[in-house]
Structures are given as structure tokens and as C-alpha cells.
Amino acid sequence: MNVVIRVDASNQIGTGHVMRCLVLAKKLLERHHTVTLLSRELTGNLIDYCRQQGMTVIALPAIEDVVSPDRNDYQHWLGVSQEEDANQCLAALKNTPFDWVVFDHYALDTQWQSLMKCQGANIFAIDDLANREHNCDILFDHNPWPDFKNRYHAFVPASSQQLLGPKFALLRDSFASLRETRKEDIKNQVIAFFSGTDPTGECLKLLSACQQIPSLPFRVVLVYGMSNPREAELLEKPLPAFVTLVKSLPDFETELAHSRYAFGGAGVSAIERTCLRLPSTLVSVAENQREMAEHLAKSGLYRYLGVSDATTAAYYTNELAWLSEHWETLPWRLPESDIDGEGANRVVDAMEAASS
């Protein structure tokens, strides 16, 4: 298969869409398919990072970033019309054969997909929102939404194959093996990560909370992403003796697996932690994570701090106090789930079957 993946990263979009597409891209390459990424040169893009990961990337023309005050105004994410974006993609692919177009972009819908489909390609839609129509051959949403099996019936053609639920989660290969070995070498630590861009400064809030506490019965490892705009402010703050501040841990999933507890978002990172059976406190770092966080918290397996736009350092101070009080009796492992780390293999299996 010759696969094109259309995905962006920016200070407003974040890095998560690109990171999960990289998982899919690497699995496709592992199966000896060709992969080309199409990504626009927005502020905070990951084009160079993707190339460092061995990817072939075509950079779409830079534009003047239009940053909406509403982080969830998804149409602003694209920067151009869907028709212009599709035409630029097709022009960039003039000498690149392709039979699959994968896209992971909240600003793209059936209008863009239909223009790409006219080229004879299969369309693979990655979505989390279920808020617009798709003209796709395969629809993917790995979130464990309530009633996830019926979520897209009104938005996709009847002929579209739907890969729904966390068993299809696009996780790096290491999660499958770490899931089996997590019972070994658990460290007395809490690890925290709030996305690559951390738009509402959750890492800074948690660090400020730690500064108000004389001691904790565990270490706190604060991991901030490569695109965190508050890096300078984080580095200026004095660190309590029980805090470690780290930028973009290269072996993050290993450190995650060896931690006893975590703070983090309710998107892909929550699926990663569930795969590892790691207890955690959730924060909705994007509006589309709110429903998911509330749903997971109702299960009784997770604690939910709230929406990141509303959280303060005091929220984290209270949560750390609660953890300290219950630290000795907290379970260090969640019950089994169907998130086994093999989702990327299942996704590529489906693409190969649809191509045969």
C-alpha cells in the first residue's frame, strides 16, 4: 500500500494527533508499505521531529497562523479552506502514488475527503468528536466512549468499516511488553504529563502546588513536552527536594510503567495509562476530553480534577494531600482491560484487508 497521512501539529492543535499518526506510520513501514506525511508549517509544528523519526514529510505552505481565542474552534486549525488544503495536498503529491489517504484533523470533513476520494484513493478517517459527516472507507475512534459502537452511525456511509473502541488504540509497541512486566520494579513516585503543549499550564500549576508542601511520601516526576510554551517559567522555579523536572523523556513509557501513580490528560495518554493498568488523576486538557474524563471517573477507577481551564494550583495541592493520606492503601494496579497494546496491528490488518 502507498499511504498518505494528513496531520498537523501547532501550539493550538497540540502534538497528540501527530504522535498517534507516527505510531500508525511506523507500523505501516514495518509491514513494508510506503508512507508520506503531509503537514502544514504552523507555529509549533513537528515536521523536523517527524523527519528525525525517519518519516518522509511534505511540508504544506506556511500561512499566517490564525489563533482563535476559543481553543475548540476547529475550523481555525486548518488556516485555509478545505478545498484549498485538498488542492495543495494533491499538487504536493503530483509525483507520489497513493492508494490510501489517512487524515487526523478536526477541521476536515466530507468536503475534503470527497476531493481526495476523486483520485481513486481509499479514505481512512481518524476522529474523536463524532460531530461531522465523513466520506470514508474506514472510520477510527479508539476512545472508550459510552455507547461507542453507535456513535458514528449518522456520520459515515453504511459501507464504511468502523474501528471503534480502545482495542484499536494506536500505542507504541513498547506498551504491550511493558504492560506484562509492570509488576516489577515499581518506583515510589507519581509521574505527571499534560500533553506536548500543555496549553493551560498544568505542569506549572502542579509545580506551584508542590512548592506549598513541605514533604510528600513519594517523588513527583514532572514531564513537560517539547512544545511547552512555559518552559522558561518552569525552569526558573526552585524545585522542592521531592520533585524532578524533565523535558520530553525519551523512555517516557518505561518511566510511566514503573511509576505507582500518575497525573495526566484524558485523551490518548489516558489510554496509555489504562493499558499499563496505572492508577491516575485525570484532567481534561481539551474540551473534547471532558465527557471522557467524567465517564472514566464514574467507573471508580480514576479520580477527576476537572477541566484545565478551571483548575488552579490549589486543586493540585488538595489532590496531593489526598494522595499523601491514602498512599499506603492505594492500589498500584488497575483491573485488566481490553487495551493490550496491539491496536496498531489491528488497524493495519484492517487496511490491508480492505486493499486486497
Residue ranges with predicted function:
Residues 339-356:
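C-terminal alpha-helical cap of glycosyltransferases
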Residues 303, 308-337, 354:
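Conserved donor-nucleotide binding/catalytic region of nucleotide-linked donor-dependent transferases
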Residues 15, 22-25, 250-292:
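A donor-sugar binding/catalytic signature common to diverse glycosyltransferases
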Residues 278-314:
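Nucleotide-sugar donor-binding patch of glycosyltransferase catalytic domains
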Residues 1-14:
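Nucleotide-activated donor-dependent transferases that construct or modify glycoconjugates
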